[in-house]
Amino acid sequence: MKAFLLDTVTVSEFRKIGRIHPAVDQWQHRHLGDEMWISVVTPLEIRKGVHLVRQKDPVFAAELDEWLINIILPGFQHRMLGIDISTALQAAEYRAIHGLSPNDSLIGATAKVHGLTLATRNSADFQATGIQLVNPWEYSL
């Protein structure tokens, strides 16, 4: 059994019921029995998106917030990893040496510290870090 840390872009893709990218859908079904984790940064990024889109599209913002509160938070309640000192120090390295954004640094460091494979569409952003990566958008049977 494998264990994955889902990047926010991957979690967001799962929301697209009926419109999910075919490769991501295949990857998700292939790994149904595997452990899927998220970082506390993912709800932060989703909630930030809610606030940013609220002015333009209040209906979508409300749907996104409802999905966060009713699906993501309870669904990952026991599979959401926080930021401890080891994660913070690793994130500092990724930020300083590899130029990752603050959020990507924290997500990448969480994967590294917990020995998880990071499932992300943005694998090129993390390539130089040595983190184990998988791009579900490139999955094929």
Say what each PLM segment does.
Residues 48-51, 74-121:
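Active-site neighborhoods of divalent-metal-dependent phosphate/nucleic-acid chemistry enzymes
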Residues 1-38, 52-68, 140-141:
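Short, well-structured N-terminal submotif of metal-dependent ribonuclease cores
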Residues 7-8, 42, 122:
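A secondary-structure boundary/capping signal
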Residues 11, 43-46, 88, 126:
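A generic structural signal for short hydrophobic patches within well-formed alpha-helices
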Residues 15-18, 50, 95, 130:
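Short, flexible helix/strand-to-coil boundary loops that buttress conserved ligand/catalytic motifs
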